[in-house]
Amino acid sequence: MNATNDSLSRTALYESHLKLGAKMVPFTGFEMPVSYAGLVEEHHSVRNACGIFDVSHMGEFRIQGPEALLLVQWITSNDASALDSGQVQYSCMPNGRGGIVDDLLVYCVSKEEYMLVVNASNRVKDFDWITSQNQWNATVVDESDDWSLIAVQGPHTAGLLQPFCDIPDLDKMKYYTFAPGNVFGHDALISATGYTGSGGFELYMRHDAAPSIWEGLLLAGATPCGLGARDTLRLEAGFCLYGNDIDETTSPIEAGLGWITKFQGDFVDCEHLKAQKEQGTERVLRGFKMLERGIPRQGYAIENSAGETIGRITSGTQSPSLGEGIAMGYINRSSATLGEHVAIRIRKNAIPATVVRPGFLPKK
């Protein structure tokens, strides 16, 4: 990673983005592409074909040693002991005060080696938290500056990538598994994961290999996509964004992440979260579909029929796939029944909306 004079870092693909005419913006300490040809076009390329994203700003930590699993189990809410080598798990790190330090991916390299992939904005905070909780003889190393990461997403991804990858039958690679391989002549870690809801892979490689792999993907027909499309894609899929839908004040139970909160063993905040799961919470994260024209945005009030505020939008957009406003937000449990009608306060107008589960696309 390179740093600029104004302290913004640049990924190994920075020059590639400029050549493609990307609109660059500051994002979590990096200069990152928000769009190339346009958000809507990029969004549809991922839903219908194959798009690529530079997500090298993400953080990667390596936890190793005979007691590595003990540390991973303690700091994360999911059950990492269920992972075999080559498997990935979505999880979160409770903060001991009812909230979330970060959500993350846990890669099981072996029972004595794990790679944690964390949000760029939380890299320093996460590393400090993990090391503060390391009461075992586990080695924790921040490898974030050593890796580039390209997300290759969409239904055509396996077919596009296969001629240039030495892993056979990519289309049969199970979701949330990974394997080392060679892509466009370079060593890489190929992970069947993503943040778009359209399938695909995430490729981890050393910085010097990133421009060549990126160029190879473009020549093979992939569309370059920016952070703008990444956000609309993840919101349509109902995926939480740290800092919007989850943070230090929201619990995984409130956020609908009970499915990654397992109680087989002890972990940070275990008893508190178990009580929440059994007794329920005062608010819950729900999805909202606008019934009339209007784009819901973060911070907008959610109101009942009496005009009382019963919640707040945490993420919202005009869905490129559906052509209507969609959002996620926290709402009082008493008003959170699926199918219930509420209103979103957009400027001076109360625009009707329906309460739905997060995840707005038809199931395929």
Give residue spans per PLM region:
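Well-ordered mid-protein domain cores that form the structural environment of catalytic cofactors
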Residues: D79-Q133
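Membrane-targeting and insertion segments and their boundary/processing signals
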Residues: E42-V46, R97-I100, L104, F184-S191
